[in-house]
Amino acid sequence: MIEKKILLTDCPDDKGLIAKITNICYKHQLNILHNNEFVDFETKHFFMRTELEGIFNEATLLEDLKYSLPEETNCRLIGTQRKRIVILVTKEAHCLGDILMKNYYGALDVEIAAVIGNHDNLRELVERFNIPFHLVSHENLTRVEHDKLLAEKIDEYTPDYIVLAKYMRVLNPEFVARYPNRVINIHHSFLPAFIGAKPYQQAYKRGVKIIGATAHFINNELDQGPIIMQNVINVDHTYNAEAMMRAGRDVEKTVLSRALDLALHDRIFVYKNKTVVL
């Protein structure tokens, strides 16, 4: 059966890598629909994303690539089927609402398996879209206890990605390790500036002239994970902290949905706490 798949390759840079990869694909009678590559000259590392069509013998293809490419090569062959996400929320609706609307009208090609909140405020919004909402309250629980319950509920849906749509709790290291490079967060500032809570108040006090938002994968350092997408807007001295917050919400939802779209289409490589987007 003819299928479409995406081949993601990264390895130490060397001469002739593109030719080697494309020749192997040709020998497997696979048609290359799109191809993008990048070399990081500082780290001497090569990245390539290849969209393929044909009849796949996945094990043999990956074995041939491994034999022909440098020893430290990473190759992944990914199907193009629709991906599943679980969204985590607290009380703010703008990022969640944007994802729900874009998914409803087909602008995001994703299955939203469930939305989980540590408060119940957004249940009505979610259920209007006929999507399950689950309350996993943090009250009277330690962070570890709450995150354990949260992970158990998430795992019922086997998502490809977990999206933190203004989820306002810090996740413990065990939770993060359970989903490496699969948890996407939106931070309400242009990282690495103004990490942590109340970034707009911090920005106002500093008299900044731009405010922004950052979507990133989470790791065990607060707001320090690999950055996927950023954007900014101009502000001036007439903006107080509340006006900055209102303007920032528009940037946040746009940046998060763009980052999610990149992940859904397998365009992100994570390397040395940075991302390469192809």
Curated annotation (Swiss-Prot):
The active site is at 223. Residues 6-85 form the ACT domain. Gene3D superfamilies: 3.30.70.260, Formyl transferase, N-terminal domain. PROSITE patterns: ACT. InterPro entries: ACT-like_dom_sf, ACT_dom, Formyl-FH4-Hydrolase_C, Formyl_transf_N, Formyl_transf_N_sf, PurU, PurU_ACT. GO terms for biological process: 'de novo' IMP biosynthetic process; one-carbon metabolic process. Its EC number is 3.5.1.10. It catalyses: (6R)-10-formyltetrahydrofolate + H2O = (6S)-5,6,7,8-tetrahydrofolate + formate + H(+). One of its GO terms (molecular function) is formyltetrahydrofolate deformylase activity. It is an enzyme of class 3 (hydrolase). SUPFAM superfamilies: ACT-like, Formyltransferase. CDD domains: ACT_F4HF-DF, FMT_core_Formyl-FH4-Hydrolase_C. Pathway: Purine metabolism; IMP biosynthesis via de novo pathway; formate from 10-formyl-5,6,7,8-tetrahydrofolate: step 1/1. Keywords: Hydrolase, One-carbon metabolism, Purine biosynthesis. It comes from the Bacteria. Belongs to the PurU family. Catalyzes the hydrolysis of 10-formyltetrahydrofolate (formyl-FH4) to formate and tetrahydrofolate (FH4). This is Formyltetrahydrofolate deformylase.
